[in-house]
Design a protein with these regions (language model features):
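Conserved alpha/beta-domain cores
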Residues: 1-151, 157-159, 167
């Protein structure tokens, strides 16, 4: 959304925003976040390794940690991750066109993230396949979360938010 829309939202009392791209978020939110500490910015799109440091400096929540290379980049900037939240992206549909680890790799990858990389993993995230019932994938993610002692889920696109609220 354009900056004008963001400013209107802030004036209406909205302080939580999501962005798909680091560069677009920098253009809109770099100054806004300095002026308004209530703003919480979520990265919902894929992250390239060369954008990790600027992303950590700007965003508060990361929904798409999905591979070892990015985890290693995050780990380099651990000191900047205080009060940041990270979700591990799980490809519950095992789609070749989507990012995320496969469900059966979740436990081992979480161990790597937490023990070796020392990253604060808050939750799990999934984007269900477009032609599948999202509830099946939300259930699968919830089970993985329970098995791995994780409390938070990032689930549901706009068209499935009502179903996501059940979890």
């Amino acid at each position: 959304h354009p900056l004008k829309s963001v400013l209107e939202a802030i004036n209406a009392g909205v302080y939580i925003f999501g962005e798909n791209r680091v560069q677009e978020a920098q253009e809109k939110f770099q100054k806004l976040k300095l002026d308004n500490t209530k703003i919480e910015l979520h990265l919902t799109g894929p992250l390239q390794s060369n954008k990790v440091k600027p992303a950590i400096q700007l965003f508060d929540v990361f929904h798409t940690l999905d591979r070892e290379k990015i985890a290693r980049e995050f780990s380099k900037y651990r000191k900047l991750l205080v009060n940041k939240k990270i979700f591990l992206q799980v490809n519950t549909g095992k789609e070749k066109t989507k990012s995320g680890i496969f469900p059966e790799d979740t436990k081992d990858f979480l161990f790597f993230l937490r023990q070796e990389m020392k990253l604060p993993i808050l939750g799990l995230m999934c984007i269900p396949p477009i032609d599948d019932d999202p509830v099946y994938h939300f259930n699968k993610l919830k089970l993985l979360a329970n098995e791995n002692k994780i409390d938070e889920l990032s689930i549901g696109m706009s068209d499935a938010y009502e179903k996501a609220l059940q979890f």
